[in-house]
Regions:
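N-terminal anchoring/stem segment of glycosyltransferases
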Residues: 1-62, 79-80, 131
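Surface-exposed flexible segments
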Residues: 16-19, 121-125
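Short, surface-exposed beta-edge/turn micro-motifs
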Residues: 2, 33, 107, 123-124
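GT-A fold catalytic core of metal-dependent nucleotide-sugar glycosyltransferases
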Residues: 43, 50-62, 68-121, 128-129
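Short, conserved charged micro-motifs
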Residues: 134-135
Length: 135
């Protein structure tokens, strides 16, 4: 099953951003999936509502500042196994995203190109990776 991931850490995004992302994914992804939000918000579990959603504490987040805390998702302590599709909380999904779920094979790492300079830079707002070899 596909793991759809997000990180809601610190004060930048209110819990409603997690709810909105969950709702967009549910509306535009037909592939079987589980939605997992890594957070430090104690009450997020009570605020965000939906089927097949998990709220987890993000490992090692204190070691990374700002958007770099998403690197914790690659740690064995994140307890992820199988295909993963990550979205930043400010991503807007307007149409079907099944192509992201089926992109590549089990060894493929996917990252989007930067809109401003697509020939030079990448943007980690959307990531596709596989943790099949995770413990």
């Amino acid at each position: 099953m596909l793991n759809v991931l997000c990180v809601n850490w610190g004060l930048k995004f209110k819990p409603v951003y997690t709810q909105n992302l969950y709702n967009m994914v549910k509306r535009h992804l037909t592939v079987p999936h589980k939605f997992i939000c890594y957070t430090n918000h104690i009450k997020l579990q009570k605020i965000v509502k939906g089927d097949n959603i998990e709220i987890r504490k993000l490992p090692f987040a204190e070691e990374y500042q700002g958007y770099w805390n998403k690197l914790s998702l690659f740690s064995p302590e994140a307890k992820l196994s199988g295909p993963c599709l990550y979205f930043d909380l400010d991503v807007v999904i307007l149409d079907n995203i099944d192509c992201f779920a089926t992109f590549g094979n089990n060894e493929t790492f996917g990252v989007m190109r930067d809109f401003g300079q697509p020939q030079m830079y990448y943007n980690s707002s959307i990531l596709r990776f596989n943790n099949s070899n995770a413990p």
